[in-house]
Structure formats: C-alpha cells, structure tokens
Design a protein with these regions (language model features):
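Secretory targeting and sorting signals
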Residues: 1-31
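Catalytic glycan-binding domains that act on GlcNAc-containing polysaccharides
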Residues: 71-73, 78-261
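N-terminal export signals and maturation junctions of secreted/periplasmic proteins
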Residues: 29-99
Length: 261
C-alpha cells in the first residue's frame, strides 16, 4: 500500500452494494487467508474498443454497452480467462462507457470482473446462466439479511419487488446489489428503457458508477480499496477481488497489451 492508502479508511457509505456489512457476501466462496492487509490496487485495464468511443449528441442515448468492446478481443479474453463472453461484454462495455463519462475514475474491466467472480461466479452461481440478451436465469438472489451472525440486519425496503422477500432485503443479480443501493444507482446499460439488477449490462454499469462514486480514482491504492470496501467491508473480500482482478490481466494475456490507464 502507498502511504496514502495506509491511512485510516474513509467512512463507508451507509448503503452498501453487497449483501452484508460484516461478512463475505458473494455467492462464490472466497479464498481465506489469515493476517491479511488491504491490497495494492490491481492494474486497471481497458479492452480493445469495437470503434472509437465518441460521446453522443446532446439528448441522444448511448448504444447498449455489450457492443462497445471488440468482438475478437472478447473471444480471446473469454477463452483465456474462462469468463463467459456475454458477462465479459458487460464488464468491458461498462468500463469503456465510464472511461468516457468519468475518465478521472480509471476503472478497469478487470475490477468489475473480480467483483462479478466473487459475487456470483460471473452469473453462473447455482447453475444460473447468462442468456444472449444479458439476462441471468434463474435469478440469483442472496440469503435474507436478517441479522444472523455475520450478516447485516436490513428490513425490507422494496416490498419484495426485486428480491421476492417482503420481510428482509436480499442481494440480487450477478453483481449482488441490495435493493436500496439499486434504487439509488440503477443504470440501464442494455438501453432497454428500464434498469434490471438481473440483466448483466444494467448490473455491470450500475456497479461501475457505484465504484467510481465510492473511490473516485481507482488507479490509486486508496481509491481502489475505498471503492471495493463500499461493496463489502470484509478484508478477505477486498483481497479476493484484487487477486481475481490482477489474475485476469496477467502480463502474458491479450488483455494486458496496450490497454491500461
């Protein structure tokens, strides 16, 4: 960690993206390691774009984010990393769009992929699949946040509209948002006219916006850790996401060539 990153962490936003405040909440089982410290920020990478990214004319919507990265690049990196190509298209499209709208954030696709792996195994947890349109089916819904040991206590905030539970909130979708966070940050990455936490493009873009709001500059150790801590305060979680994010852009992979900030 840099000296700045070793300072006491800034206060975490009151509403976290992930399922719990006290424990690991992703559907995937994180690697456990005693005596951890906050990690250094993994290298942040951008994919090869399908075409030069240009801002739309005023009042014109962005294209669906799944088409923003180069198709051949997606195929090669999906094959190398094992990330489902449709999920990878969502991560990379979100990173490319945020690079245009918030270039100071420095968010790489690999950080989104690291979170997606830990939270839901890229939308494949419990035999779920990512459909060609980006919908994850069956829907991935976490356990009730009822204050059980290691879990936050979050009474229902959405009448069960997103998570099917009118008593307790649950994290939902491939990026595992709690309903209150989704209500605040929801994005329409698929350009369908609605935001859906179970649609990968919407979920990935929402995660990108949330991370940038929480960490500001994700190329710095402090900014990256602050962003991921906003998703989940567990040090094991943060280290697990960092390890996956760095693995996905290993130097001998096609994703590492001339695509960094």
């Amino acid at each position: 960690m840099t000296q700045a990153a070793s300072r006491r962490r800034r206060a975490v936003p009151a509403v976290l993206a992930g399922a719990a405040l006290l424990a690991l909440t992703g559907c995937a089982e994180p690697r456990q390691a005693p005596g951890l410290e906050y990690p250094s920020a993994p290298a942040q990478r951008l994919p090869e774009a399908a075409a030069p990214a240009e801002a739309p004319a005023p009042g014109q919507p962005w294209a669906p984010i799944a088409g923003l990265a180069d198709e051949q690049w997606l195929e090669a990196v999906a094959d190398r990393t094992g990330i489902p190509q449709r999920a990878l298209a969502a991560y990379t499209g979100a990173a490319l769009l945020v690079e245009q709208t918030r270039p100071e954030c420095g968010l790489g696709w690999n950080t989104l992929a690291g979170i997606g792996q830990v939270e839901s195994q890229h939308g494949t947890y419990a035999d779920a699949q990512v459909q060609p349109d980006g919908q994850v089916a069956p829907a991935i819904i976490g356990i009730p946040l009822d204050g059980s040991p290691g879990l936050a206590e979050i009474p229902d905030t959405d009448g069960g509209a997103l998570d099917g539970d009118a008593e307790w909130d649950r994290a939902v979708g491939p990026m595992q948002f709690i309903p209150a966070t989704w209500e605040l940050y929801a994005q329409d990455g698929s350009r369908s006219g609605a935001s859906d936490p179970h649609q990968f493009d919407d979920a990935a873009l929402t995660a990108a916006v949330y991370l940038c709001e929480s960490g500001e500059d994700l190329t710095s150790d402090e900014g990256w850790v602050d962003a991921v801590v906003a998703y989940n305060q567990s040090m094991e979680y943060v280290n697990d996401v960092a390890a996956h994010a760095q693995d996905y852009v290993s130097p001998d992979g096609p994703s590492a060539a001339d695509s960094s900030y």
